[in-house]
Amino acid sequence: MKIEKPGNYTVSDGEDVEVFGTGEGVVIIMTGGVVSTWDSSAPVITMTGGVVSTWDSSAPVITMTGGLVRTWESSAPVITITGGYVRTRDSSAPVITMTGGEVWTLDSSAPVINMTGGYVWTWDSSAPVITKI
């Protein structure tokens, strides 16, 4: 599915979604599948499993159970995952909250990382608060 205008979108299991240059007001709800955004504002992405990839995009709320979040030169201020994997490069991800899983940052700003278990890896990054239980 290709999204080029704001709206609410419910995506069938396993379907890929591409969001190109849309304004605010995009809501994506998925079970599995892939979400990719380019130069876009996708303020709400809710997934069970699957993959979220953002490039030069603003995705202020990403909520996942499992799966993978990838950001590149993007702003993703709130990422909440149960399990799964977060990877940021040249990105701003000021709040990452995980139960298990892995956080990986490169040349990124991730000032708050809260994890129960899991793994945190940073390189040339700003992560002033890391809390692991």
Mark where each language-model region is:
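Extended beta-solenoid/beta-helix repeat architectures
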Residues: 1-133
